[in-house]
Structures are given as C-alpha cells and as structure tokens.
From Swiss-Prot:
Its cofactor is a divalent metal cation. The keyword Transferase applies. The chain crosses the membrane at residues 5-27. Belongs to the glycosyltransferase 54 family. This is Alpha-1,3-mannosyl-glycoprotein 4-beta-N-acetylglucosaminyltransferase A. It comes from Homo sapiens. N-glycosylated. It comes from the Eukaryota. One of its GO terms (molecular function) is alanine-glyoxylate transaminase activity. The keyword Phosphoprotein applies.
Length: 535
C-alpha cells in the first residue's frame, strides 16, 4: 500500500512538474514572440522615419523651386519667351504644382525644422555598448556637465549593486550624456569604461550622446512663468534630452523608467517594479510612479513613448517635463464639463503611485548653474502602511470623522491609508462609481502594522445594482436585499472583508460599508480592491 501511494505521489509530482514546465515554456515563448514583434515594428518605424526625413527634404526643395518658378512667372508676366525653354510636360507639371495647395501631415520636422539640415540629427554621435534588446525594463539616465560635483558613478553603482545576477540579464541602463563638447563626452565615456567595463561589455550599460545638429538655437527663447532666460534654456534643453533618450530606448524593452544621475535605490527595486507592473497588466495605465519627486522613477510602457515624445516636441519650449506629462493625462481622460475632482479621479487611473518610494534624490548641486536643491523623497524610508490597487473611477464619501488628513479619497487613489475616529451605528463608507461596473470580487482590509487594533468591526459590505428591476437572482440573493435597493453581500471578520460578487447583480453602481453597532476603537482602512470582471 505504501509503495502504491508512493508511486501515485511520484506520478502526480511528475505530472504537476510537466504541466508547470509546459505552461512556463508556453508563456516564455509568447513573451519572446511579443518582444520579437515589437522589435520588428520599431525597426520598421525607424525606416519610415528615415524615409519621412528624406521626403520632407525633397518636399522642401520642391517647394523652393515652385516658389522660384512663381516669382519668375510674375516677373515676366507669363511671357512666352521666358517659358519656351521648358518642355510641354514640364510646363504642365509646374502649372499643376503652382495651382494646387497640397495638404501635408505635420511631423516632427514641423516642430524641429532644423533637423532637416542634417540626416544624422537623430543618430547618436557617440554610442557605446552592444545594443541589448528584448529586456523587461530599460532605465534611462540623462547626465550633463555639473560645475561642482558629478553623482553619476555613485548612481550607477547603486543601481547595479542592487541587481541580482538574473536581473542584470533582463534590463539595460542607458546613460545619455547631454553635451555636444565631444572632448568632454569622450572623457565621461573613458571614466565609465574604466569603472564599469564588465557591465558595458555584457550589455547591461550603454552610453550615448546626441549630435550637435539635434539641438535648435536656444538663445532666443521666450521667458515664461517667471523663469529666467537661463532657466528657460535649461528646462527646454532638458525636454529635448528626455525625448532623444526615450526615442533611443523605446525599441529595447517592454517598459522604460526615467531616472536621474543623482539618486540611490532600495534593495530589490527591480523585482518590486517588475512585479508591480505585472500586477497591473490588465489595467490601462500610462505612468507608474516609484518616486514622488519630479521626473524620477516614472515608468512607461514602451509603445506609449511615441505619444509622449510627440507631445513634448510640440511644447518643449513652453513648459517643464512634469507639467507636460500632466497635460497629456488631462487631454486623454478629463472632461472640461466636469469638476477638478472628477478629473483627478480619471487621471489617477492612468497615473498610479507605488509606495514607499524606491528612489531617493541625493544630489545637492543641480545641473542648472548655481542652483542648490535640497530635495528628498519623504516616502523613501517610510514603511508600507497601505496596499495599492487600481479601482474603478468613483466618487467616495463617508459619515466618519477623518483623523489628521488621512482621507478616504487618498486611500482609494492609493496615496494614503484612511483613518477615522470611533465609528458608531449608522456610519457608512460609500464608493459611487462614475459609471456602472461589472465587479468580480472585493477586498477591504482594516488596521495596519503600526495600529493593528484600529479595525472595522460589526460592518457589512453592500452593493447597489445598476438595474433595480428585472434582476434574475436566486431566492438566497433576493433575501439579502435591503429597503433602499442595496444587497448585503458580506461582512468584516477580524478586520477583513472579502468575497465574490454574484454575477447576476452586475453591473454595480455603488459599494457601501455600513457600521451596524458602535465600535470601541478607531478605524483604519489600508487596502481597497474592487476588482473588475474580465470580459
């Protein structure tokens, strides 16, 4: 009997291992195919860009010829003697060109016409590395000459030393030297090759710099928002630097994260970032934030970089990069007829913050000449007191008295935990969706590691179906209906409420947590997850 049981157990273990291996192989092959398709698409896109450049050049030359022909025609007043030198076909073609106004689609060259002067304007002047592609995460680090101190070497050591061996094979760090002084660039490259020769030869680190022809004339920029001429020039060039770096990095991986050259990182940062992105793979996010400071730790999906770069090119002289990013989100999801709170809720679904921060700013001397910046991320050392999920856009409200600014809105958007003074019978927490949602499951977790006793007790979970009549529900579900149309579907036990939503109740208009009895303790809500049903 023991032998038989052992044989069965061995067989089950073998089958389980085989199925697991088969699933992993299938998943890995699917991922590799996706990356291969992305590379082919981006290679085609680059060929189209080069073709567009040449077409724009020829179009510009042709327009010049047409204008000259018009001028000659006007000066000679259509004299036949002046036109006898042209063949009939040439005269016909020129007549068509001068009589029609062709429509042209605006392109990058409309906003940066100086790029047409040199075909190599969008090709790195210096490029060091073996051109690794097909990774999960590309890290972009722009660096420029600093008058006092460079933090680049320390930043790279922090990033590299906190990577496990297998993680070093799944990412690439691109250092962008935003200078056109070729001697200075070669000096930086020499230092990096000396310090990180192994990482460069392995493909983990790459170094690039733009050609001088990439930059337009930055001497006559309009001063805006009270910034000095020097600061306007600095932020304008910075926008262009970001764009060049993003264009270079786009074809290399699935995600691109923007870093700076004066930061340090937390241990296990790479795995944390990758897992957080995978957790949100079914959501339509645009920016994942792993730091609250400026442009540090902002991660994008590689295909989205096209839209971001195009938008920045349109307004690179107008505003700083972080403002432009917020404008992109506003354009995508905000309704001008709705209020600011509604807009913030919509943007929060595209711009998702991870806490605590994984990157800390350490540079004291800015790349802007003479500027001292004592910027630190206050969330860097904080323990994680809430768990973040992407929830359906909703208007939230509560009858509970909020303690010290720990509001329900911040909790729902993943910014903070909710903390309220002693609940009493009749109190509620309400999540009213902007539009009805098909919900699969729910999870509400109260208390946290600093205040484990501040939990919700004697509290029920209720939902309001969008359809008040005609619901095809079981008698058991029907018995849970309340007078105001809500259905009681669960309750808190040991500070946690979780469960599935009966599909017959979908779509749902609102979730409500109702306090049934007076509580003797305060209440913290540190996790809210209303999971949408997958179609």
């Amino acid at each position: 009997m023991r032998l038989r049981n052992g044989t069965v157990a061995t067989a089950l273990a073998f089958i389980t291992s085989f199925l697991t291996l088969s699933w992993y192989t299938t998943w890995q092959n699917g991922k590799e195919k996706l990356i291969a398709y992305q590379r082919e698409f981006l290679a085609l896109k680059e060929r189209l860009r080069i073709a567009e450049h040449r077409i724009s050049q020829r179009s510009s030359e042709l327009n010049t010829i047409v204008q000259q022909f018009k001028r000659v025609g006007a000066e000679t007043n259509g004299s036949k003697d002046a036109l006898n030198k042209f063949s009939d076909n040439t005269l016909k073609l020129l007549k068509e060109l001068t009589s029609k106004k062709s429509l042209q689609v605006p392109s990058i060259y409309y906003h940066l016409p100086h790029l047409l002067k040199n075909e190599g304007s969008l090709q790195p002047a210096v490029q060091i590395g073996n051109g690794r592609t097909g990774v999960s995460i590309v890290m972009g680090i722009p660096t420029v000459k600093r008058e006092v101190k460079s933090y680049l070497i320390e930043t790279l050591h922090s990033l590299i030393d906190n990577l496990y061996p297998e993680e070093k094979l799944d990412c690439v760090i691109v250092v962008f030297i935003g200078e056109t002084d070729i001697d200075y660039v070669h000096g930086v490259v020499a230092n990096l090759e000396k310090e990180f020769s192994k990482e460069i030869s392995s493909g983990l680190v790459e170094v690039i710099s733009p050609p001088e022809s990439y930059y337009p004339d930055l001497t006559n920029l309009k001063e805006t928002f009270g910034d000095s001429k020097e600061r306007v020039r600095w932020r304008t060039k910075q926008n262009l630097d970001y764009c060049f770096l993003m264009m270079y990095a786009q074809e290399k991986g699935i995600y691109y994260i923007q870093l700076e050259d004066d930061i340090i990182v937390k241990q296990n940062y790479f795995n944390t970032i990758k897992n957080f992105a995978l957790q949100l793979s079914s959501e339509e996010w645009m920016i994942l934030e792993f730091s609250q400071l400026g442009f540090i730790g902002k991660m994008f999906q590689a295909p989205d970089l096209t839209l971001i770069v195009e938008f920045i090119f349109m307004f690179y002289k107008e505003k700083p990069i972080d403002w432009l990013l917020d404008h992109i989100l506003w354009v995508k999801v905000c309704n001008p007829e709705k209020d600011a709170k509604h807009c913030d809720r919509q943007k929060a679904n595209l711009r998702i913050r991870f806490r605590p921060s994984l990157f800390q700013h350490v540079g004291l001397h800015s790349s802007l000449s003479g500027k001292i910046q004592k910027l630190t991320d206050k969330d860097y050392m904080k323990p994680l007191l809430l768990k973040i999920h992407v929830n359906p856009p909703a208007e939230v409200s509560t009858s509970l008295k909020v303690y010290q600014g720990h509001t329900l809105e911040k909790t729902y958007m993943g910014e903070d935990f909710f903390w309220a003074i002693t609940p009493i019978a009749g109190d509620y927490i309400l999540f009213k969706f902007d539009k009805p949602v098909n919900v699969e499951s729910y999870l509400f977790h109260s208390g946290n590691q600093e205040h484990p006793g501040d939990i919700l007790l004697n509290t029920t979970v209720e939902v309001l179906p969008f359809k008040s009549e005609g619901l095809e529900i079981s008698k058991e579900t029907k018995d849970k209906r309340l007078e105001d149309g809500y259905f009681r579907i669960g309750k808190f036990e040991n500070g946690v409420a979780e469960g599935m939503v009966d599909p017959s109740l979908n779509p749902i208009s609102a979730f409500r947590l109702s306090v049934i009895q007076n509580s003797a303790v305060w209440a913290i809500l540190n996790e809210i997850h209303i999971k949408k049903a997958t179609n």
